[in-house]
A protein has these predicted regions:
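N-terminal, intrinsically disordered, polar/charged segments of Gram-positive cell-envelope systems
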Residues: 6, 18-75
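Short beta-strand segments within Ig-like beta-sandwich modules, predominantly Fibronectin type-III
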Residues: 108-116
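Surface-exposed, short loops/turns at beta-strand junctions within beta-sandwich domains
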Residues: 123-131
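Short beta-strand elements
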Residues: 146-162
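Short edge beta-strand/loop segments characteristic of extracellular beta-sandwich folds
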Residues: 82-90
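Short acidic/polar inter-strand loop motif in beta-rich domains
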Residues: 139-147
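Short proline/glycine-enriched turn/loop motifs at strand-loop junctions of beta-rich domains
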Residues: 91-96
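C-terminal motif of bacterial Sec signal peptides marking the signal peptidase cleavage site
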Residues: 13-16
Length: 162
């Protein structure tokens, strides 16, 4: 009888000690996948590119738009972590993805029809007081490492809200 009890307790101890290891392995694999997923989304800003193509970028704020060279203002409250700004993309090639950058940092990509309205999230440095640039870029074969076929920008400024 004692042998059965000792054997039973030994089995329980072995099973109990083995389970957390599997859990840790699963957690580490999950973290690895998250890191790899963020690497895939890295798109480098095309340095030295000049305005090309017929696409147009328009920033829309409650203060106005960037149409006709105007520079609209976004008022940022003191403890804001994320601020959205409306963006209108037009006249881009509809068969290509349009990559959007804020201050040369990749934020998102869109499939643009004749005119597409969307929002861009301003974070961290883009919330600092000053002038900022939103850039829309299209690449040959939708490959960010390829040739730039459309490159257009719009400027806005941020100021602290009173």
């Amino acid at each position: 009888m004692k042998k059965f009890i000792i054997t039973g307790l030994s089995v329980l101890l072995l099973v109990g000690c083995g389970a957390p290891q599997e859990k840790e392995d699963a957690q580490s694999k999950q973290e690895e996948q998250v890191v790899n997923a963020s690497d895939e989304n890295m798109v480098v800003f095309p340095e030295g590119a000049m305005s090309i193509g017929e696409g147009k970028v328009k920033v829309i704020t409650p203060d106005g738009t960037s149409e006709n060279g105007n520079i609209p203002t976004v008022f940022i409250k003191k403890d804001t972590l994320i601020q959205q700004v409306e963006l209108e993309l037009s006249n881009f090639q509809s068969d290509k993805e349009t990559f959007v950058f804020v201050d040369q940092m990749y934020t998102d990509k869109h499939q643009v029809t004749s005119t597409t309205q969307t929002t861009v999230q301003l974070k961290e440095k883009a919330l600092e007081t000053g002038s900022h640039t939103i850039t829309a870029v299209q690449y040959e074969n939708n490959d960010p490492k390829g040739k730039v076929i459309s490159f257009n920008q719009a400027t806005f400024e941020t100021k602290p809200a009173s």
